[in-house]
């Protein structure tokens, strides 16, 4: 599994993150279980909003108020309860998380939403920065939705750079295949952030699967089953 296409992308994502964070703090100093909320807030400066009864409706209402608009809701979009949600778009990128979850579950949900952000936003932003380094400040403002720059969009089009993504809002029975693929990817990234492959495999002992599962929960904070 380590050499699968999925895992190679996961390793590329996490390595890019650790390289970026190296200018802020030493990733090797992050103790297990890792505090994902701290990493999001101080490493990537992405806001985290906790809601005790998080739902799609609650998130939309919050974003309306943040944009200075009257709260509104589209009747054709069914409301549903959420553990977490990544919003990509104006007024800024935000991660929502349900506040009344157990600490280790909330930490995992945040890691999952961070996985979406890293794969769908962060890597694309890093590619733009690498391709157009002279536009660094503009790219950072554009990717944080502080402004729209038509010239930058044109340069990106000429260079063949990918567009900024939109947020996922559809899950459940109507889940699109590409969205399901993104969910699997975010789940794998979350697990790699919380329990790095190389660290975990060095601790595994044959014929001790029960003890190993308990170790993943106690030392790394992994939930016993997939939640998101």
List where the protein language model places each region.
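Active-site hotspot residues in diverse enzymes, especially metal/ion-binding acidic/histidine motifs
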Residues: 1-228
């Amino acid at each position: 599994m380590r050499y699968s296409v999925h895992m190679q992308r996961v390793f590329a994502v996490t390595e890019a993150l650790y390289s970026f964070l190296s200018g802020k703090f030493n990733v090797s100093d992050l103790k297990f279980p890792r505090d994902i909320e701290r990493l999001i807030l101080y490493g990537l400066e992405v806001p985290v909003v906790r809601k005790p009864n998080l739902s799609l409706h609650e998130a939309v209402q919050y974003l309306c108020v943040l944009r200075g608009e009257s709260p509104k809701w589209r009747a054709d979009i069914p409301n549903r309860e959420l553990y977490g949600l990544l919003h990509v778009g104006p007024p800024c990128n935000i991660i929502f998380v349900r506040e009344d979850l157990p600490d280790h579950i909330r930490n995992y949900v945040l890691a999952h939403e961070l996985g979406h952000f890293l794969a769908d936003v962060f890597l694309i932003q890093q590619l733009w920065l690498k391709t157009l380094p002279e536009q660094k400040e503009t790219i950072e403002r554009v990717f944080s939705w502080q402004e729209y720059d038509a010239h930058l969009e044109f340069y990106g089009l000429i260079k063949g750079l990918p567009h900024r993504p939109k947020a996922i809002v559809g899950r459940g029975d109507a889940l699109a295949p590409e969205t399901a693929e993104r969910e699997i990817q975010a789940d794998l990234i979350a697990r790699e952030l919380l329990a790095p492959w190389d660290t975990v495999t060095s601790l595994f002992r044959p014929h001790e699967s029960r003890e190993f599962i308990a170790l993943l929960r106690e030392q790394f904070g992994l939930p016993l089953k997939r939640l998101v």
